[in-house]
Structure formats: C-alpha cells, structure tokens
C-alpha cells in the first residue's frame, strides 16, 4: 500500500557533483532521506516501469537507506530495482551495473574516503543512465525541489533480504539482489590481461592489498585471490564494516 506522507523542507539539501553529504545524525532526522530521494524522483521524467540501481559502500546507515529507497522506488512507479548483495556496490561497480542493464539511473550511498560510523559521514548520490553523476542541471533541479517539497511517496512493506541473491516483489515492483562483484569483475577481465597477471602471481609475485575495511574488499578478494590466483591472505581488512574498523579509509592521509 502506498503512503503519501506530509513533510516540510530541509534548508540544507543542496547536492554537489558527489551528491549530498552530511553527518549521519543529519540523515537520521525523520523524513530527511525521504525528502531528498523524493526530490530526486520529482526532478526526473520518464522512469515509470524502468530499472533503478541501488548500492553503497557499506558505511553506517547504508542498509537502512537502501530499504527506504527500495520502498520509495516502488511507490513512485519504478518497475525493477537491482540492489547489491548486502547493500554493497562500489561507485564504479554501480556505474557498470547501470550501463550493463540499461537502468534509468541509480543511487550510490557513499561519502567517499570520509570516515564512517554513527558520529561520522554519510552520502547519497544519484547517477544517470550513462552511469555518471547527475549533471548540474539535474542537481540544481533537485535542490530547488528540496526547498518546496510537501510530501513523499513510500510503500508500507517489510524490509527485503539484502543478504540472499535472488528476486522478490515489493508492491508489484521486482527487486533483484545481485552479486555485487560479478559484473565488475567481468568488466575488469575485459579491460586487463588476466592470463598475464595470473602468470605473474604463479611465478611468485606477491603483494598485499589493504582494503581498509571498506567497499573494495569483496572486489579485491574476487579479482586478486579467486580470479588471478594470488595467495589467500593477499587481501587484508577485506570485509566492509560500518565504521571501517574505526579507521579513516583513505590511503593518502599524509
């Protein structure tokens, strides 16, 4: 059942090229995420029945935001949602999924290298059908809408199971939980000479990849250790954590 929820604008929802970034506690305000997402939908045309991609870097609030956007996509008339397993999709992986499956667009939940956790940062970015960030004309329209929004649409539905690959339905909209890594790994195999790199590892080459408990971990495990034959343990800190293991996930802090 679709609910139309009355709301009032927030004055601070101006997105940049990297989307809307604020502290987690700002996003946790009642209606804050919903207002911004509805403002994005209200600024777009022609998405009825189309496909929307959703995923993020696994930081604190990621899973909750995914569930909200799924229910709002159903209420606003999307025909299908593709969401990464566990709510995980790196920014380039999300871009690839949008392009590969001909999606109308997608939401990427990330604040890049900014710290994660209940007292740290969160972000929402909308990417268009070419996989890239929304252009200024779209972000300006979104900001204008955030200043006048009076209601948003959301279906009353249970949370979907984000951890099991497969399909389900939310208020008549198809939701597919997909392997977060498979399509991106396949793209990398098209772009790079995997047999040559595999031979390099087979010859004794060693490296250590520190994923910093952030989103790259599952991709690094699959590509380096499973597909290229690097020894188990090549990837360290490879499980995404909501607070990135209490570390700042930036390899260039100096």
Region annotations inferred by a language model:
Residues 2-10, 31, 118-254:
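Gly/Ser/Thr-enriched, mixed-charge loops and adjacent short helices
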Residues 23, 51-57, 127, 206-210:
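Short glycine-rich or small-residue beta-strand-to-loop segments that form or flank ligand, phosphate
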Residues 28-37, 41, 61-62, 90, ...:
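Phosphate/oxyanion-binding active-site loops and adjacent basic polyanion-contact surfaces
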Residues 33, 37, 62, 66-70, ...:
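Short, highly selective alpha-helical patches that border small-molecule cofactor pockets
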